[in-house]
């Protein structure tokens, strides 16, 4: 068997390291814009998700509260596009969680909110939160 020259071995190792580390940065940040995934989660997804949870727990909602919930649901829906933008998405699992589970769930949620149907809203919200766990299980590192 012919021996593989050292330069080629070294080059392969560097290439593999490069691919692995760029996949990691891709998850944490897009390719051109400064926003990190962590910032979007903390600044947008988590607060809107919490407001929906609180709002739906309150059950009997007034018009003003429904209107606020619609804002939250619409922002989560828009987030399903942000998470796919700027080359942030690393694989099919991410794509399914963002552009299917989160997007479809939040669209359903918005419909339920517009028709002020609390039961439908609760069930759509549970779809929305399935996207969090699906994506986190694969792509969010264990607690630091
Ligand atoms: C398509 C993937 C994806 C989806 C969907 C997703 N997340 Fe995340 N989330 C991540 C990744 C990746 C991180 C880790 C970011 C890092 O630490 O670099 C994260 C981190 C977080 C964090 C921790 C942020 C911090 O300050 O460290 C919170 C909170 C969070 N997500 C909430 C949610 C909630 C709530 C949902 C569902 C409504 C959700 N996420 C849906 C990918 C996703």
Model-derived regions, located:
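Positively charged n-region of N-terminal signal peptides that target proteins for export
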Residues: 1-9
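Intrinsically disordered/low-complexity terminal segments and short unstructured peptides
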Residues: 5, 21-24
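Bacterial N-terminal signal peptides
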Residues: 9-19
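Extracytoplasmic c-type cytochrome modules immediately beyond a signal peptide or single-pass transmembrane anchor
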Residues: 24-127, 144
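The canonical Cys-X-X-Cys-His
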Residues: 128-139
